[in-house]
Amino acid sequence: MSASVSRFASDDSPSMSWIVFPAAVCVLCAALLAALDLNEAWFIAWNTAASGIAPGFVWAGITNLASTLGAFALITPALAWRPRWLAATLLAAPVATLYTHGLKQFFAEPRPAAVLAQDQFNVVGLPLRTDSFPSGHSLTAFVIAGVVVLCASPAVRRQWAWVVLAAAVLMCFSRVAVGAHWPLDLFAGAAGGWLSAVIGVRWSAHWRFWERRRGVQTMGALMILVAVLLAFEDLGYPEGLWMQYLLVVWGMAGAVFALVRPVTCKVPA
């Protein structure tokens, strides 16, 4: 295995602080928000501020990055160099799905469009009214961020972790910007996403199919299918179609490149 791959593939286990701290911060923020009854006030303030920061099509594009298929397309080019990233994301997906859909069904919380008057906030895309808690997009953003940060070597983690986390926070914030979620939903989704990433990374250290040529080829073929499905999926944000199509091209190109140029490590024939 080459040095560049082994540096990320080796079990450079992150410290317990990296495993626990991001999720703990999100849980604490969610608890304070609920205890102080600031959910609605913060939503209106954040949503109003977002409309002054960037136009709707920008927020729609950012929010599409954190859709399920969009996020897989986003991370697909890593397959050629960092196959563990995609493997850990795939392994985290079942846990993340159970978390978000289980809580959505249990709580069945209304979204802002079902509670607030239409003139109180800005909506980008189709208005959503049901199954608000937790935010699936926020969960997805933090699954990707968690995988990238936790799979990285300590040196890379120290240098880039905060950049990756800032990008994930921006994707989460876009859910309030488009009027789809309460702030409480974002924190709950982010916490679940990070913990799902922890599990996915741990499982990827046990099931190392990503080190084999056949494993890389299988993931590449799966990501081609993801890109095709993304091309036809209605994400609910017509203003963000530009990002959706960019993700299709990005994911398809990344998958094809990984299949044409297998990851540079010693694998069985």
PLM feature segments, named:
Residues 25-26, 69, 89, 93-97, ...:
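Alpha-helical transmembrane spans of integral membrane proteins, capturing the lipid-embedded, hydrophobic core
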Residues 122-265:
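Membrane-embedded catalytic cores of phosphoryl/pyrophosphoryl-handling enzymes
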Residues 63-82, 137-142, 146-147:
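Hydrophobic alpha-helical transmembrane segments
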Residues 96-100, 104, 171, 196-197:
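Alpha-helical transmembrane segments of multipass membrane proteins
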Residues 57-60, 87-88, 155-162:
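Membrane-interface alpha-helices at helix entry/exit sites of multi-pass transporters
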Residues 18-32, 92-96, 165-168, 221-226:
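Alpha-helical transmembrane segments
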Residues 18-19, 75-99, 161-164:
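Interfacial segments of alpha-helical transmembrane regions
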Residues 1-70, 101-130, 262-269:
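N-terminal transmembrane-helix/juxtamembrane module of multi-pass inner/ER membrane proteins
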